[in-house]
UniProtKB/Swiss-Prot annotation:
InterPro entries: MDM33_fungi (IPR008839). PANTHER family: SENSITIVE TO HIGH EXPRESSION PROTEIN 9, MITOCHONDRIAL. It comes from Emericella nidulans (strain FGSC A4 / ATCC 38163 / CBS 112.46 / NRRL 194 / M139). The lineage of its organism: Eukaryota, Fungi, Dikarya, Ascomycota, Pezizomycotina. Residues 88-113, 348-361 have a biased composition (Polar residues). Pfam families: She9_MDM33. The gene is she9. This is Sensitive to high expression protein 9 homolog, mitochondrial.
Length: 471
C-alpha cells in the first residue's frame, strides 16, 4: 500500500502534465475572457492547483492594471501549493508556462498596436486631405489663384488711379457730398412737417381753451364752483398755451430756414457738379483730339518714311532685279548668236525695226498671223539675194557681221512712238485697268497702300476739321 505523500506527489505531477499539454494547443487570443470563480467548496482532500487547470488568458488590449491584479491573484493561489511541500521543480514549471503565455500575449498586443499605428498614416495620406492636395499643387497654379483672388481689387485700384489722373475723383467727391446733402434736405423737410404739426396742435389747444373761456364768460352770472375752478384753470393755461404756440412757431421758422438752406446748398452742389463734369468732358475731348492728331501725325510720318526711304529702296531693288534678268537674257542671246549661224543683215534690221513697236503695243492674234505671213513673204523674196550674199560674205567673221548689224540698227524716234499711241491704245489701257483679271500682289504692297490711304484720309479729315473750326 502506497503512502499518502507519495500519492499526493503523483496526483500533483499528473495535474501539471495535463496543464503543460493543454497550454500549447490554446490560441494566444481567447474569444472571450473566462471568469475566475473560486468557490470555497472547490478544495479537495489532496491539494491541486486550480490555476493550472483553469488558466486565465488575458485579452490583447487589456490594461496593465488588470494584468498586475491577475498576477497578484495567481501568486496568492499558488502560495498554498508551496505550503503543501511540493518540489521546487514542479512549482517553477507552471510559473515558466505563465510567463511564456504573458510574453506571447504582450508581443501580439504590441504588434497589433504597431500595425494599427502604421495603418493610420497611410489612410490619412491617401484620404485626400486639403493640406496634402495643397502641397501637390504647382507654383504656377498657386500664383494664378492668388492673381485671380486679387483681380477685383487690382481692377478697382486701376480705376481709382485712372480717375485720379483724369481728375474725376473730385467729381466723385462732389457726388458723395450731393448724396449727403440730399439726406440732410430730407431730414430738414421731415422736421418742417413735424414742426407744422406741433404748431397746428398748439393753435388748436389755445383756440379750444379760448373758446371755452368765452363760453364761461357768457354765463358768468350763473357760475357754479366747478365753473369757477374751470375758468381759473383755463386762465392759467392760456399763458402756457401762448408760450408753446410761440415756441412751435419759432421751431417751424427755424426748420423752414434750414430746409431752404439745404435746398440752396444742394442746388449749388448740383450746379458745381454739372460745371465740373462739363470741364472734365471738355478736357477728355481735348485729350482725345490731341490723341487723334498724334495718331494722324504718326500715320503721316509713316507715310513720309515709306515714300522717302522705303519706296526708293524697293524701286531700286526691283530695277536691279529687272536689270539682272535683262543682262541674263542678253547673255543667253549672245550665246545663241555665237552658237547659231548669223541671219542676213537686212533681215535682222527689219526684225529690229519691228521689235520696238511690238514691245510697246501688244498685238492681237490676227496681227501676229499677218506679221508671220509678211515675214515669210519677205524671207521667200530675199532668199536668192541672201544666198548670194552668204556666198560672197562666207569669208567674213561673225563678229564683223554682228557689228555691222548693230550699226545698221537705229532706234525709233519720239514722233513715231507718239504717233503709234492713239486713242484706241489709251482706251485699251483704261479697259485693262478696270478689268477683272487676277493680279498677284504681295502683303507688303497691300500694307503700304492701306497705310497710304489711311494717312491721306486722316490728312484730308484734319484739313476739313481745321477749316470748319476756323470758320
Amino acid at each position: 500500500m502506497q503512502s499518502m505523500p507519495w500519492l499526493f506527489r503523483q496526483s500533483l505531477r499528473t495535474g501539471l502534465n495535463l496543464s503543460r499539454t493543454s497550454l500549447p494547443g490554446r490560441s494566444p487570443i481567447s474569444p472571450a475572457p473566462i471568469s475566475k470563480v473560486h468557490s470555497k467548496t472547490a478544495r479537495r482532500n489532496f491539494s491541486v492547483c486550480l490555476r493550472c487547470h483553469f488558466r486565465y488568458q488575458p485579452s490583447l488590449r487589456s490594461d496593465e492594471i488588470k494584468r498586475s491584479t491577475d498576477e497578484k491573484q495567481d501568486k496568492k493561489i499558488e502560495e498554498p501549493v508551496i505550503a503543501l511541500g511540493a518540489p521546487e521543480s514542479t512549482q517553477a514549471e507552471p510559473n515558466a508556462g505563465a510567463q511564456d503565455t504573458s510574453q506571447t500575449a504582450d508581443t501580439v498586443h504590441t504588434q497589433g498596436q504597431e500595425g494599427k499605428k502604421e495603418d493610420e498614416p497611410g489612410s490619412t495620406q491617401n484620404g485626400g486631405l486639403p493640406s496634402y492636395i495643397e502641397d501637390r499643387r504647382s507654383q504656377f497654379s498657386k500664383q494664378f489663384t492668388t492673381w485671380m483672388d486679387n483681380l477685383q481689387s487690382n481692377v478697382f485700384v486701376a480705376g481709382q488711379r485712372l480717375n485720379d489722373l483724369t481728375g474725376y475723383s473730385s467729381i466723385e467727391a462732389l457726388k458723395r457730398n450731393i448724396q449727403e446733402q440730399e439726406k440732410r434736405l430730407r431730414a430738414a423737410r421731415h422736421r418742417v412737417r413735424t414742426a407744422k404739426e406741433a404748431y397746428a396742435a398748439a393753435i388748436n389747444r389755445r383756440s379750444t381753451s379760448q373758446r371755452e373761456v368765452n363760453e364761461l364768460l357768457q354765463r358768468k352770472h350763473a357760475w357754479s364752483p366747478a365753473d369757477l375752478e374751470r375758468f381759473t384753470h383755463l386762465y392759467r393755461n392760456d399763458h402756457t398755451n401762448e408760450v408753446a404756440e410761440n415756441e412751435t412757431q419759432e421751431a417751424l421758422s427755424a426748420a423752414e430756414r434750414e430746409s431752404e438752406e439745404a435746398a440752396a446748398s444742394l442746388t449749388k452742389s448740383i450746379l458745381s457738379r454739372y460745371h465740373e463734369e462739363q470741364v472734365w468732358s471738355d478736357k477728355i475731348r481735348r485729350m482725345s483730339t490731341w490723341g487723334t492728331w498724334g495718331l494722324m501725325g504718326v500715320n503721316v510720318l509713316l507715310f513720309l518714311i515709306f515714300q522717302i526711304a522705303v519706296e526708293p529702296w524697293r524701286r531700286k531693288r526691283l530695277v536691279k532685279g529687272f536689270e539682272e534678268k535683262v543682262l541674263e537674257a542678253i547673255e543667253k542671246e549672245k550665246i545663241l548668236v555665237h552658237s547659231q549661224p548669223v541671219p542676213p543683215v537686212e533681215f535682222t534690221a527689219t526684225q529690229d525695226a519691228h521689235s520696238p513697236t511690238s514691245g510697246l503695243v501688244t498685238p492681237s492674234p490676227g496681227d501676229n498671223i499677218a506679221s508671220e505671213e509678211s515675214s515669210e513673204a519677205t524671207v521667200a523674196a530675199n532668199t536668192p539675194t541672201t544666198t548670194a550674199e552668204d556666198e560672197a560674205s562666207g569669208s567674213m567673221a561673225p563678229e564683223n557681221i554682228t557689228s555691222s548689224s548693230l550699226e545698221s540698227y537705229k532706234p525709233p524716234s519720239l514722233q513715231s512712238l507718239l504717233s503709234s499711241m492713239s486713242i484706241e491704245c489709251c482706251r485699251q489701257y483704261i479697259h485693262y485697268l478696270l478689268s477683272e483679271s487676277p493680279v498677284t500682289v504681295t502683303q507688303r504692297d497691300i500694307s503700304v497702300v492701306a497705310a497710304t490711304s489711311a494717312a491721306a484720309g486722316a490728312t484730308l479729315m484734319g484739313l476739313v476739321v481745321a477749316l470748319i473750326r476756323s470758320q
